[in-house]
Amino acid sequence: LPDLLGRLVQLEADVLYQEPPGEGEHRIGSLRGTTPVLLSAAHGAVHTRRGEPKQEEEFTAAMACLVAELTDAHALYARRRSPTDPNWYRDVPYKRRLSRIVA
């Protein structure tokens, strides 16, 4: 169990909740697996709904990644602040990326 908790903390260190992506960085992260399951953590970083920031759901990105690593599933997660809310708006980068993974 301590190894899993340590790995969870390592994975969450990649998520900068409040920060927009820097030059050359992606606001969305993903892991590819072979198991036909996709784990999604769309609110892993601060996101914006109707012009207002909404707090991140801490450690959801890391949990999605950890479970993906353990099961060889796919994972898609927010890793930097987003000007959109992928669970609220239809045509946003997160959903476009999700569509490419499941296609």
Task: Give the ranges of each region predicted by the language model.
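N-terminal catalytic or cofactor-binding beta/alpha core of small enzyme domains
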Residues: 1-103
